[in-house]
């Protein structure tokens, strides 16, 4: 059984939620059948979106430092419950010997398996500007639909003034509003492309499937950890 390493703190609530989902998705009948999980919750990692938009400190030194600590502690592979941090995944991979399983790569595979051609993306402006979703999804022939500039302001408010600030009601209201707009424009599924989105949006909220990368990576992590 392999040990899962979670590079967390981006944000703390999303990190706790990923751990919860790993536990729930593990087909265990007793404690001893669960994989070992090492969580490094490092909320001091600089804001990823601010850096991508040229307004903040480079998060890579802290991301790499945290990944190295997970490796030293015995993690066999690393996952990150932060979509925007995946813009730096190659930099982290080069600095460590253990693999990072990319949440975005795994989500692209899942959407392809489900047969969707147009996916609406709810994510931070940093994630959208970095192009990480377009890059991975284009490999599988899936078009990424993003909100307009004004709609994206609502998404960012929902994430930062809503979920990250502990105001889940505001976060849910703003994110659901934008999800429904993308749905009306022809999105065949909605990607919860920021872990704060998956904290407040649920499948029952939408007519089209809600694809949650946090669910996808939790399932993949459990599968890899339990492989003989």
From Swiss-Prot:
Say which enzyme class the record assigns: isomerase
Please give the subunit comment from the record: Homodimer. The existence of the interchain disulfide bond seen in the crystal structures is uncertain, but disulfide bonds have been reported for cytoplasmic proteins from thermophiles.
Task: Identify the SUPFAM superfamilies for this entry.
Answer: Aspartate/glutamate racemase (SSF53681)
Residues involved in substrate binding: 47-49, 83-85, 164
What organism is the protein native to?
Pyrococcus horikoshii (strain ATCC 700860 / DSM 12428 / JCM 9974 / NBRC 100139 / OT-3)
Put simply, this protein is called Aspartate racemase
Annotated transmembrane regions: none
The record's listing under PROSITE patterns reads: ASP_GLU_RACEMASE_1, ASP_GLU_RACEMASE_2
